[in-house]
Each structure stands twice: as C-alpha cells, then as structure tokens.
C-alpha cells in the first residue's frame, strides 16, 4: 500500500462519476468505480494489489460506511411508507416466494448448492439505487407509493438474512451474532431518541458548531467502528453493523449536518476505495475459463427481474416491477463476504455482480417507461427533513 495507490484511487473517485454523467442513463456512480477496479485488477493490467492488508482494511471501513449510508437512506419515517405498508409487504413476500422457487431451479441447473443465496439475491431490492431513480424522474402516484415499503422491507430483510444463508454451516453462530448486532442497534435507537427528546443533542450540537469540535462525526464514527468490532467478534459481517446503525439513525431522523459530513467521507474517498477494491478483487478471467458462470450471472439478473415483474399479477405495473428489481448492496455484500469466507466457487462472485448489473440496466429502463406512462408527480420522494430549529442529532 503506497501513496501512489491512494492517488490512483482518488483519481478514479473523480473519474468514476463520468459513466453516470448522462442523466437519461440513470446509472449509479459505483458502476464506474467497479469497472475501474476490474481494469486495474487481475482482469485488466493487474496493477492494484487487492490482497494488500492495509488496502483491504481501508476497504472494509468503506464497506461499513457504504452500508451505513444505505441504511440511513431507507425512508422509514416517510408517512407514505406506513400508508402503503400492507400491499408493499404482501408484494415483498410474494417476490420472495417466486425468488425461492427460481433459486432452487438455478442452483440445481448449475450445481452450486446455493439455492438460498440465489433466492435472497433475486428477492432483494436496493433502496440506494431505486430512490434516486424515483427522485430524478419525479415518479409518483399510487404504484410508486406502494413501491416504497416493498423496497424498504426487501432491502432490510435481505441484508439481515444474508449472513445466515451465505454460510449455512455456521447459521446458529451467525444468528446469535446478528441478534447481538441488532440488539445493539435497538439500544442505539433508544439512546438517540432520548438525546433528541431531552435536548442533550441540541446542546452538544451547539457547542460543537461554535467550537468546531465535529462531535457528530466523531461520535458517529466511534459508534460505527464499535458496532463493526462487535460484528467481527461475533463472526458477522460489518455490513449488518453499518446498515443497522444507519436504520437507527433514519428512525430518529436523518441529521443534515452529519449526513453531509458522512457523505463527504464516504463518497469522497472510502466509498470509491471500497468499490475499486471490490472490482480489483474480482478476477473476471475466470468467467472465460468457466463460461457457465456468465450464464449464471445473466440467469440471476433475469430471475430477479422475473420475480419482481410477476407482481403484475397482483396489480403492480410491469415498469414499477422492473424498477423494484434493482440490486446493489446485497450482491456486493454477498460477493465480498463469500470471497472472504471462501464459500463461493471461482468465478461465482463475478457472476453475482454480473447479475446485479443486469438488474440495474433493466431498472433504469423500467423507471423511464414508468415516467413515459405518466407515473409522475411534482414532489420527489425523499426522507422528510427535520425542522431547522431542531439541528442535528449526534
């Protein structure tokens, strides 16, 4: 690990958004970063040492921050989420049932034995991808409102369940670790809400702002790293630690100042570093020697789309179903954890990412079709902003 490596990654962090620059494509910035990592890794010129201990550790910090941001973006406080909760929950469960059947079929065809993992991937939805598309296209109407809880439920459930299904031999240990992390997140939520209601947060914020202490950022990083340490000690991925902490913050209310600080830290450096490292960790040359995994990746992507589009049978427009199929966080986490635990076959992590790319492309098309179909409204869907007098939570 050298400053030259960091300089290259920082340049990629600048160039990564170029792929997402055309607004009509609605492609996430991370695609450019992943592609850059792939080109710098063993698939391309092999100049980025993804196995470097220091780089890997920095990437894990970025992973925790990326999952925290994803959790904080779940619109759990949006009143429209509660209004459409029932139909959204029904559709999320129905997608899971269809995905379970498809997972068994795909696992049997390819002989991998990962039916549960494939089902989880195909049932997942990425709030971090879907909500920006909804906002940029100004999508609205009842079908879009019903999409919110469906995505929130699927995103949360799949991320919580992933550590259990990716390593079933240690499912009991993983379950206990997951419970410990989730219990810690629940305690954090209670504590954050208490600080908010008693005004302690406001007083600390005022002192921090006046004295330039950056208490919000320091406190949040301390909590995040503490939860990551708990996750590692209980043999659980830091993915769950970051995501559950993000949900706890979202339940209290997305803090504007903290959101800006963590956005700068995550999107400016550690997030791109993680995605570049992930791309460099994927040896896509294996797909050339195992072409069946190319078919597996396409099958997973198309299976996810089919499972979500099938909700047309219970009233969801096909374009919205295609949009709901967008995946990112769960496949990225599965590829990362599977590689670290050595539970996936050579080329399988790349196949998971290929499937995610297929869903992203189709989701962008689905969003555009929904806009053309007139599913548009003036207000964008976003996390409700807190009153300006309430400041930022710790």
What residue ranges belong to the model's regions?
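Hydrophobic alpha-helical transmembrane segments in multi-pass integral membrane proteins
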Residues: 3, 45-47, 100-106, 157-169, ...
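Structural signal for the N-terminal portions of transmembrane helices
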Residues: 3-10, 52-62, 146-155, 161-164, ...
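Intrinsically disordered, low-complexity non-transmembrane regions of multi-pass membrane transporters
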Residues: 7-10, 186-219, 254-259, 372-394
């Amino acid at each position: 690990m050298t400053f030259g490596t960091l300089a290259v990654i920082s340049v990629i962090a600048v160039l990564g958004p170029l792929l997402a620059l055309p607004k009509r494509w609605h492609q996430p910035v991370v695609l450019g970063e992943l592609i850059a990592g792939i080109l710098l890794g063993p698939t391309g010129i092999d100049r980025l040492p993804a196995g470097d201990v220091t780089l890997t550790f920095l990437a894990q910090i970025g992973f925790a921050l990326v999952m925290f941001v994803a959790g904080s973006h779940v619109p759990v406080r949006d009143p429209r989420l509660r209004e459409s909760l029932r139909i959204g929950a029904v559709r999320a469960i129905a997608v899971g049932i269809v995905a379970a059947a498809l997972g068994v079929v795909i696992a049997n065809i390819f002989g991998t034995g990962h039916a549960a993992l494939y089902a989880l991937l195909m049932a997942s939805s990425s709030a971090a991808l879907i909500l920006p598309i909804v906002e940029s296209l100004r999508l609205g109407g009842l079908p879009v409102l019903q999409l919110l809880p469906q995505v929130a439920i699927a995103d949360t459930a799949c991320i919580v369940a992933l550590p259990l299904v990716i390593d079933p031999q240690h499912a009991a240990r993983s379950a206990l670790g997951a419970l410990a992390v989730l219990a810690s997140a629940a305690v954090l939520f209670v504590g954050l809400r208490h600080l908010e209601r008693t005004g302690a947060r406001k007083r600390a914020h005022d002192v921090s702002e006046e004295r330039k202490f950056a208490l919000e950022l320091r406190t949040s990083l301390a909590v995040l790293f503490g939860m990551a340490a708990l996750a590692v000690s209980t043999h659980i991925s830091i993915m769950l630690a970051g995501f559950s902490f993000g949900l706890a913050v979202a339940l209290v209310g997305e803090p504007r100042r903290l959101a800006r600080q963590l956005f700068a830290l995550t999107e400016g450096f550690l997030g791109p570093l993680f995605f570049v490292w992930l791309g460099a960790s994927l040896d896509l040359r294996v797909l050339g020697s195992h072409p069946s995994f190319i078919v597996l990746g396409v099958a997973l992507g198309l299976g996810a789309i089919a499972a979500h589009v099938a909700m047309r049978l219970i009233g969801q427009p096909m374009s919205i179903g295609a949009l709901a199929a967008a995946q990112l966080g769960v496949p990225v986490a599965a590829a990362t954890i599977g590689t670290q635990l050595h539970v996936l076959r050579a080329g399988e992590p790349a196949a998971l990412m290929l499937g995610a790319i297929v869903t992203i492309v189709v989701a962008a098309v689905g969003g555009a079709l929904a806009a053309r179909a007139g599913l548009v409204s003036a207000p964008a869907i976003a996390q409700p902003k807190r009153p300006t007098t309430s400041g930022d939570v710790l």
